[in-house]
Structure formats: structure tokens, C-alpha cells
């Protein structure tokens, strides 16, 4: 056996024999992408919710916004712990795509703001429900799967509330 093959084999065996906690840990690409997407959603939804707390035309929308801010802020911090347990990190700043969406919403005023905010919340929470269900079912990291499963009821409630408020406007 050549020295290179022997050395490669020994290195591979050494890595396999490391205690589990000392091996480099990262989530598989799909789990890592889910963590990043969820963090972006939490930060963006909380930011838009804060805007709505101040700018919404009705108290019902302001109250919904307050709930969304609290829930998604808490969720972001929970997600930070989940990512840490999974050996990953999550973004700490809103990306440029979400910044553009925030900027577009900032142009709305009054009842148009309420409509645009609720429409955005409905669309975003529908997207999140789909992603969280997929992660809960097909994710590979049990910690991340469990997080997705536990977070779903809150996301579904937000969607239901946003849709109800949109219907009340009609």
C-alpha cells in the first residue's frame, strides 16, 4: 500500500474515532438554508410589525402587529439556540431583498398601509407554513425538525389572524 493511501486511510479513521462533540458540526445544506430563511423571516416580519404598530390606521391592525413582533422576536431568539445546537449560525441582519420589500411598504400610508401590511403578512406566513411543514417532515436534523414542528401553530395563527383582518376590511 502506498504511503499516500495509508495516510489518507489513517486520517479518515482518526476523524471517525473523534468523540462526537469534537467533530465539526454543520447542518446539511437544506437544514442550513431553512435556518437562514426562518431567521430572515423572523427579522423582517418583526421589523414590519414594529412599523405597523406605529403606522397602522386601526387598533386591530396595531394589536395584530404587536403580537407578530413579540412572537417573531421570541422565535428569532429560540432559533438562535436551535442553530447553535445544530452547529450553525443564523443571519443577524435583514438581507437586501427583504430591505427592498420593507422600503416598498414604507411608502404606504393610512388604510392602504393596513391593507399592504396584512397582505404581506398573509403571503409571508403562507410561505412560512409551507417551508416549516417541509422541514418538519423532510429535515434531517432532529433538533431543527422539532423546532419547525413546534413553531407551526403560531405561524398558522398569524396567517389566520391576518386573513381575518383582511376580510374585515372588505
Which positions does each model-derived feature cover?
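His/Met- and acidic-residue-enriched segments that coordinate or traffic transition-metal cofactors
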Residues: 2-8, 17-170
Amino acid at each position: 500500500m502506498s504511503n499516500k493511501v495509508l495516510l489518507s486511510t489513517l486520517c479518515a479513521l482518526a476523524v471517525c474515532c473523534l468523540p462526537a462533540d469534537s467533530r465539526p458540526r454543520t447542518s446539511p445544506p437544506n437544514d442550513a438554508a431553512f435556518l437562514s430563511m426562518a431567521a430572515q423571516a423572523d427579522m423582517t416580519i418583526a421589523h414590519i410589525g414594529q412599523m405597523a404598530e406605529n403606522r397602522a390606521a386601526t387598533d386591530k391592525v396595531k394589536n395584530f402587529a404587536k403580537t407578530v413582533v413579540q412572537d417573531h422576536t421570541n422565535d428569532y431568539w429560540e432559533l438562535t439556540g436551535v442553530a447553535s445546537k445544530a452547529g450553525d449560525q443564523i443571519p443577524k441582519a435583514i438581507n437586501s431583498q427583504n430591505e427592498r420589500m420593507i422600503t416598498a411598504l414604507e411608502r404606504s400610508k393610512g388604510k392602504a398601509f393596513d391593507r399592504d401590511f396584512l397582505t404581506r403578512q398573509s403571503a409571508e406566513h403562507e410561505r412560512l407554513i409551507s417551508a416549516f411543514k417541509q422541514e418538519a417532515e423532510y429535515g434531517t436534523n432532529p433538533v431543527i425538525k422539532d423546532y419547525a414542528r413546534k413553531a407551526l401553530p403560531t405561524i398558522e395563527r398569524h396567517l389566520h389572524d391576518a386573513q381575518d383582518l383582511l376580510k374585515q376590511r372588505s
